[in-house]
Structures are given as structure tokens and as C-alpha cells.
Amino acid sequence: MGTTAYPHRERQRVLLTGLLPDISTDPAIETATDSTEAGRSGTIVAPVGIRPPLLAAVATRAATPLVVLTATGRDAETLTNALASWIPGVAMLPAWETLPHERLSPQVDTMARRIAVLRRLVH
């Protein structure tokens, strides 16, 4: 039996922004946000499931843009999608599609997306 596609249904994002004030009052979340806000530590180690709301809490209290590093492009995409449910304005800096020693240039749209994200960080 095959699967049925529903082209008329768009994938809708569930917004969790209403939960953020309650999550932000958790003592562990407060400790992490206070630590990063005071400049004591820029490293947060947390289980995968709590990372999006934790980072959203840190980002909402930060006076500057929050930059998060991930191990892989796939991790970055997953985290970007999850964070977008918690806070607006999430962007991902796409990876170059070529290796430094290759004579190929990245796609124009990749370069444009990278420039757009870098511009947002500066302005």
C-alpha cells in the first residue's frame, strides 16, 4: 500500500514562545543564562532535548546576537528548526559546499545566504 501526499497541507511550525517565561524560571536554566550573561562562561553543556529552550532563554536575555556552534551541518539544521519554534529571527550560516583545496566555487545562493547571515550579525 502506498502513501498519500497532501500537497495542500503546508507544514506548520508549532510556536512554543509562550512556554519560554516558565522555562526561564527553572533554577538550572537561570544558572546557565546568568553565567553567560555575566560573561563567566560561553560554554553550555546540556542534554540534546533541553538545548533549544535553553538557548532561546539565553538569546532572549542577551544584549548581542547569540552564535551557536554545532558539530555538523545536519546538527545545525536540526537546531535551527527547533530554535525557530522558540524565538523569532533564527538564522543558519550555511556551510561551504566545497573543500578549500578544490577549484570549485560554492553555489551563488549559498554565498548569498552566508552574506545575509553575516550582515545580520554586524547590523
Predicted feature residues:
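ASCE RecA-like P-loop NTPase motor cores
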Residues: 1-123
